[in-house]
Each structure stands twice: as structure tokens, then as C-alpha cells.
């Protein structure tokens, strides 16, 4: 059966995507520099205009700046330059194309680094962009999968489900009758993004020389890592399979099945979720019990992703959450994910647990332990400021306005004042928590997400630290412990030889540093022997801790 053809080249409400040959590296460099210089002078003009409005424009420096702007005025975009600087910034990112739109969307989350006026404006970046014509969309499928569309699909809906900066999606029906979503990269996007990333990394290194406090090179490298994965749709397929495996024991939380036989670098075919988004009016008509069940599933799934798995949806918004008729919840659009290593995930778990249990001092301590600090950082002042912020939240009598996600974001945003930074994954995690909290209030206004989170966090704590799991984790260390037992006599012998050698030397204190070495070796050997004989873990854990302390002291 032939695939249904498009009847409307206007894309039914979408502007038509004008396909152009991607500019080369030199071309993109010229375009990028043009907008960068334009933004620089636009910022200077906005600064002068602001000072003039405040009657502060009569200083010598301001007069010189105004005089210099006269010479470049004929070359400026008059309509754009008269806008406030945050608006200029957003519009120039949109002009530069998909890479910079994605960059702006990431920067909109960095309230810890950028002024609020800029982050608020960047939240207005376009998310409904021109769509590739339907005939061209089918050609891209055939090129990507190297076979005619009619051999794979009975029908493809001409109207796009969505058209973003990098890709476009349509609903379709496979020849095997399953309803699916086809996601296709827009033509030229990968080449443009790859060239832009080369230039962005160069710009990041240059900005690092002048704005080292804001770590532009690190921020841009983080962004480049995320974006390169988004222009290879195989990564999104892997993400969907990882999420499904992590939640295989939770049938009420669903992730779309990927049809790998119809997927490649540029094409992704996945299960279509027929359901409602949280904004739908039908959701408001559900009973209180049904709403609480949905919130329980959504909040529980999000907390589980972050604090148990360390692998979470990093582009969550209400449109990416699906509510099914049988009151299950589904997550879609899985191209952007965040990952925590074991140590960070554990600290995040302790931090969040302290928050929901109302322990500001511990929460501030664990939040500080995850920060990126330098010799210029004022860690103690930051910790005190965070603790005071938590105390104010806890004293608040109006818990209807209590936003746990906003509290975390405000805490992280304080870091910039004290020369402290946080990894991008933590900012993405905060955005995910804010989104799921907002969805909770959308479905059931007035819900206290802190209370809803408490049971899930306590469950994860119990799972992570029950005796059986600790014994299994300890068993993984058996080879290292056996090796330690074998090497301990030699280490002890070497320590004694060192002691004998130092005793023969004429020193004011020949035993300095050696006593602790012997004690460290003794504790290590004793702990290893206790492990070998199956003694309870508190006994050998304490000995290993003492060995570590003595070793550091020596």
C-alpha cells in the first residue's frame, strides 16, 4: 500500500523550512563573528541608553563610549540594537541557528552564573521552528534507512507532531500495524552543529582569558558534549532502552519502545504514546485520589532516576510527560539525559534526604561537598548563606507556596557570589525537579512535593543501605582484600625496617611519622584478617578507617 502523500505544502501551521547548503567552517566563522561583534556593540549601546535614562551618561568614559558608537551606527541593525540587551542576545542566538538555540536553552538554566534578566529572556527561545516539507521528510527517511518508505510504513501523517531546532517528528503506521513516531534530523543540521562546536570551543578558550570567573570553556565543553549526542539519534535509542531496563519492575512507568530495524544515525522510529499531557482539561476532572496516584508515579519515577539510577531525563517539560487512560505515566523525548557518578549520586541522595527531612545544616554541608571550588572560593560563607536560606523556607507558614525545586535552584544560584560553581549535571537535575514539581501543582494545586518525595527518598535509602546489599557490595571487594592480606606482612616489614633505619640516624625525634605508619599497618592487617574470618562489618570497617587516618597523619 503506498504511503499517504501530503496534501498541504504549508505544513498546517508550521512555517516551511528553507533548505540551504550548510556553510563551511570559514563561512560559519564569519557569520558567528558578525553576530558576536554585533552583540558586543549592541550591549554597549544598551548600556549607554540605560545610563542616559538614569542621568549617569555625562562622565568622561561615557562620553567617549557614545562618541565611538557614532562611527559604527551606520553598520548596525537599527531595529535590533534598540532592544534591551537580553532580547538582543536571544534574537541573535535564533539567527545563528540550531546550535545556538540549544546553547541558549542550556544557558537559560544557569541562574547560578548569569543575571536573571538574561536567563528569563532565554526561556523565550523558539521551540516551534519551520518544518521540512513532507515530501522532503520522506526522502530523508529513505536516505537514512536506504529503502523505500512504502516497504516500512503504511501511512505517515503529513502534519508534523513537532518541529524543533534539530529534528522533526511525524506519526506513522508500520506495515505490521503498530503506531509509531518517526524522528528525523533536519537536513544539514549535523554538519552545521559540528562546525559550530569547533568554533564554540575556540570562543570558549578565548573567553576563558577574560572571564575566567565564569568558566566559559568548561560550560561550552559541557554543552558540546550534550549536543553532539543529540545529533546522533542512536544515542536517544540507547537512552530509551536504558530507562526501560531501569524501570522493568515498575509497569506503571513507561518509556517508548525503539524499533531498531527502522532507526539509524538520522532516523529514529519509536512507539507512539496515545495519551494526555498534564495540561489537558480532562486531567482536571480526575478524582483527587487519581491525581495523587499520578503525582506519586511521576515524582517517584523522577526521584528514582536521579537518586537511585544516576541516569535521568534532562529535558523534562509538561509536553514530554504522557498520562495514559489506565493512569500510567510515560516519558518521551529522551535525547538529553544527565548522569551522576556513584559518589555524586550518593551525595545528592544525602542532600535531598536532609532537605525533605528538614535538616538545614546537613543539607548545606552536602550541597557544599558537591561544589567546584578554587582558592578564591569562600566555602564557609556560602554554607552559612545556604543554611540561612533553608531556615527561612522551613519557617515559612505558607507551605502551598513551598517549592522544593526553586529552593535548590536559589541555593545553587547563591554559589556565584562566593566564587563557587556547580557541574552542569546538577543544574539539569534541578531543572528536572522544578519541572516535575510544576507538573504536580498543575495536576493537583497546593500539593507539597516535599512530603510526596519523603517516602520515595526513605525507600531508596533503605534499598541502598540494607545489610544484604552491603554484604554483596563487600563481596565485590574480596579480590582486593585478599591482595591486601598478602601484601600486608611485606608492608609491615618495610615499616619496621624504616623504623630501624631512622633510629640509627641522629635526629631530634627519630620516631616522628613512624609510629603512625606502624599503627596504620597493624590496623590494616587486623582488619583484613577480620574480613577473611567473616567478622561483622562494623569491626573491620572501623579498623580500615583507623588505618586510613594513621596513613594520612604519617
PLM features per residue range, with description:
Residues 116, 123-130, 142-147, 190-195, ...:
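ATP-dependent phospho-/nucleotidyl transfer catalytic cores
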Residues 1-168, 194-216, 550-551:
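N-terminal accessory/targeting segments that precede structured cores
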Residues 538-548:
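Hydrophobic core segments of alpha-helical transmembrane domains in multi-pass membrane proteins
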Residues 172-173, 316:
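Conserved beta3 strand of the Hanks-type protein kinase catalytic N-lobe
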Residues 11-25, 46-60, 83, 264, ...:
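Helix-rich C-lobe and terminal helical cap/extension of kinase-like folds
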Residues 319-323:
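Hydrophobic residue at the +6 position relative to the catalytic HRD Asp in the kinase catalytic loop
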Residues 171, 178-186:
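Glycine-rich ATP phosphate-binding loop
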Amino acid at each position: 500500500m503506498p504511503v499517504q502523500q501530503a496534501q498541504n505544502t504549508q505544513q498546517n501551521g508550521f512555517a516551511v523550512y528553507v533548505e540551504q547548503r550548510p556553510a563551511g567552517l570559514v563561512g560559519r566563522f564569519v557569520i558567528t563573528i558578525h553576530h558576536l561583534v554585533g552583540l558586543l556593540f549592541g550591549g554597549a549601546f544598551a548600556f549607554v541608553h540605560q545610563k542616559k535614562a538614569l542621568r549617569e551618561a555625562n562622565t568622561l568614559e561615557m562620553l567617549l563610549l557614545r562618541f565611538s558608537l557614532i562611527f559604527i551606527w551606520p553598520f548596525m541593525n537599527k531595529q535590533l540594537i534598540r532592544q534591551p540587551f537580553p532580547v538582543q542576545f536571544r534574537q541573535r542566538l535564533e539567527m545563528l541557528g540550531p546550535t545556538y538555540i540549544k546553547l541558549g536553552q542550556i544557558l537559560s538554566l544557569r541562574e547560578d552564573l548569569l543575571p536573571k534578566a538574561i536567563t528569563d529572556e532565554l526561556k523565550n527561545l523558539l521551540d516551534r521552528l519551520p518544518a521540512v516539507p513532507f515530501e522532503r521528510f520522506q526522502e530523508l527517511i529513505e536516505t537514512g534507512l536506504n529503502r523505500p518508505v512504502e516497504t516500512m510504513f503504511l501511512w505517515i501523517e503529513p502534519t508534523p507532531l513537532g518541529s524543533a531546532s534539530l529534528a522533526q517528528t511525524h506519526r506513522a503506521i508500520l506495515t505490521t500495524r503498530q503506531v509509531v513516531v518517526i524522528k528525523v534530523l533536519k537536513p544539514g543540521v549535523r554538519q552545521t552543529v559540528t562546525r559550530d562546536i569547533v568554533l564554540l570551543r575556540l570562543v570558549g578558550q578565548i573567553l576563558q582569558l577574560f572571564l575566567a570567573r565564569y568558566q566559559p570553556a568548561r560550560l561550552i565543553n559541557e554543552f558540546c558534549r550534550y549536543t553532539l549526542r543529540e545529533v546522533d539519534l542512536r544515542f536517544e535509542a540507547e537512552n530509551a532502552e536504558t530507562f526501560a531496563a531501569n524501570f522493568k519492575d515498575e509497569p506503571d512507568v513507561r518509556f517508548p519502545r525503539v524499533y531498531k530495524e527502522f532507526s539509524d544515525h538520522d532516523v529514529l522510529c519509536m512507539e507512539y504514546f496515545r495519551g494526555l499531557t498534564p495540561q489537558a482539561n480532562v486531567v482536571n476532572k480526575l478524582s483527587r485520589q487519581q491525581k495523587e496516584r499520578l503525582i506519586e508515579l511521576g515524582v517517584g519515577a523522577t526521584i528514582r532516576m536521579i537518586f537511585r539510577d544516576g541516569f535521568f531525563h534532562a529535558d523534562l517539560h509538561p509536553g514530554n510527560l504522557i498520562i495514559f487512560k489506565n493512569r500510567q505515566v510515560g516519558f518521551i523525548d529522551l535525547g538529553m539525559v544527565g548522569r551522576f557518578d556513584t559518589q555524586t549520586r550518593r551525595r545528592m541522595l544525602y542532600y535531598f534526604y536532609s532537605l525533605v527531612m528538614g535538616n538545614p545544616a546537613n543539607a548545606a554541608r552536602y550541597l557544599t561537598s558537591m561544589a567546584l571550588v578554587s582558592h578564591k572560593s569562600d566555602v564557609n560563607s556560602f554554607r552559612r548563606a545556604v543554611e540561612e536560606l533553608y531556615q527561612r523556607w522551613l519557617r515559612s507558614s505558607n507551605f502551598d507556596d513551598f517549592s522544593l525545586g526553586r529552593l535548590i535552584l536559589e541555593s545553587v544560584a547563591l554559589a556565584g557570589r562566593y566564587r563557587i560553581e556547580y557541574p552542569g549535571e546538577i543544574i539539569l537535575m534541578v531543572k528536572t525537579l522544578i519541572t516535575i514539581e510544576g507538573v504536580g501543582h498543575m495536576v493537583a494545586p497546593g500539593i507539597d512535593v516535599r512530603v510526596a518525595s519523603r517516602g520515595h527518598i526513605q525507600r531508596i535509602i533503605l534499598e541502598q543501605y540494607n545489610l544484604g546489599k552491603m554484604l554483596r557490595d563487600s563481596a565485590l571487594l574480596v579480590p582486593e582484600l585478599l591482595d591486601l592480606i598478602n601484601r600486608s606482612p611485606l608492608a609491615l616489614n618495610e615499616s619496621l625496617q624504616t623504623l630501624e633505619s631512622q633510629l640509627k640516624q641522629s635526629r631530634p625525634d627519630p620516631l616522628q611519622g613512624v609510629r603512625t605508619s606502624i599503627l596504620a599497618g597493624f590496623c590494616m592487617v587486623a582488619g583484613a584478617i577480620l574480613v577473611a574470618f567473616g567478622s561483622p562489618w562494623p569491626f573491620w570497617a572501623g579498623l580500615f578507617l583507623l588505618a586510613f587516618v594513621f596513613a594520612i597523619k604519617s
